[in-house]
Amino acid sequence: MMNLKYLLFFCLVQALHYCYAYGDPSLSNELDRFNPCPYSDDTVKMIILTRENKKHDFYTLNTIKNHNEFKKSTIKHQVVFITHGFTSTATAENFLAMAEALLDKGNYLVILIDWRVAACTNEMAGVKLAYYSYAASNTRLVGNYIATVTKMLVQQYNVPMANIRLVGHSLGAHTSGFAGKKVQELRLGKYSEIIGLDPAGPSFKSQECSQRICETDANYVQIIHTSNHLGTLVTLGTVDFYMNNGYNQPGCGLPIIGETCSHTRAVKYFTECIRHECCLIGVPQSKNPQPVSKCTRNQCVCVGLNAKTYPKTGSFYVPVESKAPYCNNKGKII
């Protein structure tokens, strides 16, 4: 039943991609008349985690100063925003696991953005998949919200933009991109990095840079591609990693039927890279990619938090295994 549901969703989002051009005024007018997933700043919540405080309490723009870190005059942590996608939440197991991996790795301040209302998560199970276009239309607004929080961090807590990184999955990747555009508009500078985990394809993949996540949205934009229907194979970033060629991830079953598994696998790959249980090595894309065993630091790039320390940019093929930690490099680290 679950696979049938996502097969129907696949058919739906393909229809939406061709019937509703993102940013089309006629679509905007229709969404204004009836929006089952309305955006409001009041419905966006934040979970704020540090090594010292891992409580999953929700905060808003009005209550954020009740958190201990925001009672200080300066925040010295590296900051990571994590943003979920369509019909998901900040409390989904995959995102909490990512946050935990970050805190195990370094002394981060992790802010999970929960925009479940505008992402249509609260709608009836049999109906909400039809509301994708409404959630897609809310991504820029959620991006503006993240930019507002960023402005607070920079201007009130002396956090350098170089200390702020955004991670977003699916629609959350485009939301992160819109945040990157907004902070530049506010003259705050650029984020250190934006990491797009299988950015949503429907409604976005044929759009110009201004209407989706783009390589100019941060100093470094890392894209991890894992599905070609719910996601996209279009190059979007400073580096684009095509895991198993960007679709049909090992262990996810048949094409299309396993599309949702492939789409969410991007989150799991990135989390494993944070844990450094292995280095998922990207080799430059070509008709005949070189073996991982012959990679050097100047030729290839490891997926993850350290990707931007490698000199090479562009598109990379990344071989993966079907089970965590997903390595296909026999322990090689470059």
From Swiss-Prot:
Tissue: Expressed by the venom gland.
Protein location: Secreted
Role: Catalyzes the hydrolysis of phosphatidylcholine with phospholipase A1 activity (6.3 U/ml). May act as an allergen and induce hemolytic activity.
GO cellular component terms attached to this protein's record: extracellular space
Family to which this protein belongs: Belongs to the AB hydrolase superfamily. Lipase family.
Posttranslational mods: Not glycosylated.
Keywords noted in UniProt: Allergen, Cytolysis, Disulfide bond, Hemolysis, Hydrolase, Lipid degradation, Lipid metabolism, Secreted, Signal
Catalytic activity, EC: 3.1.1.32
Major enzyme class: hydrolase
Active site: residue positions: 170, 198, 263
Propeptide: 24-33
Reaction(s) catalysed (UniProt annotation): a 1,2-diacyl-sn-glycero-3-phosphocholine + H2O = a 2-acyl-sn-glycero-3-phosphocholine + a fatty acid + H(+)
Superkingdom as given in the UniProt entry: Eukaryota
Cysteines paired by S-S bonds: 37-120, 209-214, 252-261, 278-302, 279-327, 295-300
Biophysicochemical property: temperature dependence: Loses its activity after heat treatment.
Pfam hit, one: Lipase
Keyword Disulfide bond (UniProt): yes
Primary residence: secreted
Protein name: Phospholipase A1 2
Signal peptide positions (record): 1-23
SUPFAM superfamilies: alpha/beta-Hydrolases
Biological process per Gene Ontology, one example term: lipid catabolic process
Molecular functions per Gene Ontology: phospholipase A1 activity
The keyword Disulfide bond is assigned to this record: yes
